[in-house]
UniProtKB/Swiss-Prot annotation:
Keywords: Ribonucleoprotein, Ribosomal protein. It comes from the Archaea. This is Large ribosomal subunit protein eL39. HAMAP family: Ribosomal_eL39 (MF_00629). One of its GO terms (cellular component) is ribonucleoprotein complex. The keyword Ribosomal protein applies.
Length: 51
């Protein structure tokens, strides 16, 4: 991907980066470990972004 990106694409990429994090520990404690995995997790090589 090129170094110079449009602002809209950059914002969408940043949103996907933020979504690709693990569930915080305090969320697991608050939900009594019912929520332990993030369904939006994606591997950078295997998952394709449709942006």
């Amino acid at each position: 991907m090129s170094r110079n990106k449009e602002l809209g694409r950059k914002i969408r990429l940043m949103k996907k980066v933020k979504q690709n994090r693990r569930v915080p520990g305090w969320v697991m404690m608050r939900t009594a470990r019912k929520v332990t995995q993030n369904p939006l997790r994606r591997n950078w090589r295997r998952g394709n972004l449709k942006i």
